[in-house]
């Protein structure tokens, strides 16, 4: 197999699952930004965004859940390394036309491996928390477009998902 072809880093030469050995890698500044969206019915979105109905409580709870999920990522994803997070930030924007809550998670570290999984886990858990807190008003809520939007640092450098 050529070195220029992509490989699955969590499989060894015989195809067995393995944790990537990062022991000899140098620490580097690393940043990852992930995005997700939660789409719901106009009625549920109206309840979420109506003044006095708890938008702040729902989004603040989702924010804390996202931060906690990033911190626990290595316990949730079997081959993830535990790493020292320097920062986790969760931001929300409201799409009134699409009845969506858009989520952006940013994770930062100085370590031997990246924080992409932490950022995507943070986004996913924030989205699940919004679902949980709004499901009484809409069982058909959809979590969509969980994705890595940006990463920097390490051997592969900067990458954008435009």
Swiss-Prot record:
Catalytic residues (UniProt): 132
Pfam families named in the record: MoaC (PF01967)
GO molecular function: cyclic pyranopterin monophosphate synthase activity
Keyword hit for Lyase: yes
EC number of the protein: 4.6.1.17
Quaternary structure note: Homohexamer; trimer of dimers.
Name of the protein: Cyclic pyranopterin monophosphate synthase
The organism of origin for this protein: Bordetella avium (strain 197N)
């Amino acid at each position: 197999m050529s070195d220029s072809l992509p490989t699955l880093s969590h499989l060894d030469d015989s195809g067995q699952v393995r944790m990537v050995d990062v022991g000899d890698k140098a620490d580097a500044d690393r940043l990852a930004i992930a995005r997700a969206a939660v789409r719901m019915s106009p009625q549920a979105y109206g309840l979420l965004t109506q003044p006095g109905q708890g938008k702040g409580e729902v989004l603040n709870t989702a924010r804390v859940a996202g931060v906690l999920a990033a911190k626990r990522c290595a316990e949730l994803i079997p081959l993830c390394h535990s790493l020292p997070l320097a920062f986790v930030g969760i931001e929300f924007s409201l799409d009134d036309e699409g009845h969506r809550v858009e989520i952006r998670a940013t994770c930062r570290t100085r370590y031997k491996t990246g924080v992409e999984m932490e950022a995507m886990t943070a986004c996913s858990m924030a989205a699940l928390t919004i679902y949980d807190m709004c499901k009484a008003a809409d069982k058909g809520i959809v979590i969509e477009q969980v994705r890595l939007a940006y990463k920097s640092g390490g051997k592969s450098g900067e990458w954008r998902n435009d």
